[in-house]
Amino acid sequence: MSKIRVHEYAKKHNISSKDLMTKLKEMNIEVSNHMTMLDDEVVNKLDNEYQTEKPSVADEFEVEEKVVRSKKNSNKKKKKGKGNEDKRQENFAGRQQTQTVETPDKITFSGSLTVGDLAKKLSKEPSEIIKKLFMLGIMATINQDLDKDTIELIANDYGIEVEEEVIVSETEFETFIDEQDDEENLKERPAVVTIMGHVDHGKTTLLDSIRNSKVTAGEAGGITQHIGAYQVEVNDKKITFLDTPGHAAFTTMRARGAQVTDITILVVAADDGVMPQTVEAINHAKAAGVPIIVAVNKMDKPAANPDRVMQELTEYELVPEAWGGDTIFVPISAIQGEGIDNLLEMILLVSEVEEYKANPNRYATGTVIEAQLDKGKGTIATLLVQNGTLRVGDPIVVGTTFGRVRAMVSDIGRRVKVAGPSTPVEITGLNEVPQAGDRFMAFADEKKARQIGESRAQEALLAQRGEKSKLSLEDLFQQIQEGDVKEINLIVKADVQGSVEAMAASLRKIDVEGVKVKIIHTGVGAITESDIILASASNAIVIGFNVRPDVNAKRTAELENVDIRLHRIIYKVIEEIEAAMQGMLDPEFEEKVIGQAEVRQTFKVTKVGTIAGCYVTDGKITRDSGVRIIRDGVVIYEGQLDTLKRFKDDVKEVAQNYECGITIEKYNDLKEGDIIEAYIMEEVKR
């Protein structure tokens, strides 16, 4: 005979676990709790013990027969309908007694369970589960969801094992990625390098020096507006560079660059030192867990002080190798081209130490660096292949879009047929413009790729619809629900997706008390008539970044009086919107005490109330001021003046050292010695 637990034996013999444990103690058998295992010897002793106490079958039958007879006799005296109901209740009770439900050894669930569902799985009454939850301090109803910890707590109390089922999504790329690549299949790949740093410290100039080109002059305001990806060859080895904009407004783009990068080059100007965005770049690189190489730029300037840069960076745990640390510092002059070769050698050295590898013999996976809509070519996406090999003709799913790779162009504009790990390529053939930062995956079967792409698009659409319907409800009832809170609606259009994201992120960060920013629509490309119609319906301002409205959009905007703001520099946008938001705010007031008067005598007048004869001790009392009644240093009332008189004449104000008569609106409990403090509310300039 196998061992049995205390609670199982108790259930088998229709007794409570507590009574059984008491009985075992009487028999000098030690048990710690209801989960204790009972061996065969103890079970036999218990069987004998309960057998002696159990009534005989004949006795049970006799008792049962008497009960049945008595019930039958009593039923004769009742109405027929009532008797039938009692009989049904008896039969139901009988079935309940005879039906025994076994407690499961293990239950499974996914996500969460309601109290009712948990009771069903545990073969218990919901009321029993609710009672247990109450004892644990949890007030729950039968339809209330329980979290994983609570489910495990209740199940373990019954000695039942709990297992959570993980639902595998057919739209997640991880579902289709096989297990880790075997070491023998991994090959060396180029390092992906991101250049970061403060504005105007020379990030784009450094990249230009590496690529022997001058891009800086063509950018508006000296800002690198778009993320680009380039590949260079050094000593027969390749290095891939991601060019992330350095301004704080492009935090999202820079963070995305750090997620796909292997090495970060931190550019710090030797004459400026560490600046706010330098620290921000350090934090992004550290969060991504990538090695940092510090390029001390502008060494050709007379004010260059590399030692100060090193000293400042030690505060951020970037200690130079020369000072006993492990951070590589390379002095360079990007504009003169000095130190560039040394910097590239350091990148190759770090790559060699870190051993960056990937498996080229599989279908490609990677990240979207940039995406835009071209009139001639259609959707163009810049992809960084991170694992596997991408080939022309491969079915591909990119974010919520899908298609087949029609053509691939390298960073230097040449058509290529294959792209291995760490290679940036520009592809065409997608059905829609993906989001910058989206993951992509190539498939063997076009039908499967289409199915996954459509499913992902459907999921995104449902989520978007849910979000839109929620926002529209807030629009309808906003004034009722929020009252004084104002809101500014914006539509953001830009030339590329990266700029759209950066602009939206910057605008959402604007913090002006009392006003919210709501971006109701974003998009890539020219401002269209549909954008203007949406702006008109939503009372929104349209912001164009490096784009212009088409002819129809201009005409419609004039008819609908829609405000369109066009910019090429992001900071102009931020400043303009902040100003608009501050203008929309209700004026802010602060209190200013203008005078005090002491109550010298009081007079009670019928139909008027209490008149206080006062002496102005400080400042002045004005007719339109608010007042406080102060008695023994405690404010006992706050309200408005009703009348202010000198002798029998109404006056606008009474100055210091003059007497006056005062009545307070809706207040008559004035006493001699009270202090009347007068104040006004002044508008505060923002």
From Swiss-Prot:
The keyword Metal-binding does not apply. The gene is infB. This is Translation initiation factor IF-2. It comes from Bacillus cereus (strain ATCC 10987 / NRS 248). Residues 243-246 are annotated as: G3. One of the essential components for the initiation of protein synthesis. Protects formylmethionyl-tRNA from spontaneous hydrolysis and promotes its binding to the 30S ribosomal subunits. Also involved in the hydrolysis of GTP during the formation of the 70S ribosomal complex. Residues 197-204 are annotated as: G1. Residues 297-300 are annotated as: G4. Residues 53-105 are annotated as: Disordered. Pfam families: EF-G_D2, GTP_EFTU, IF-2, IF2_N. Residues 222-226 are annotated as: G2. GTP binds at residues 197-204, 243-247, 297-300. HAMAP family: IF_2_B. Residues 69-81 have a biased composition (Basic residues). GO terms for cellular component: cytosol. CDD domains: IF2_eIF5B, IF2_mtIF2_II, mtIF2_IVc. Belongs to the TRAFAC class translation factor GTPase superfamily. Classic translation factor GTPase family. IF-2 subfamily. GO terms for molecular function: GTP binding; GTPase activity; translation initiation factor activity.
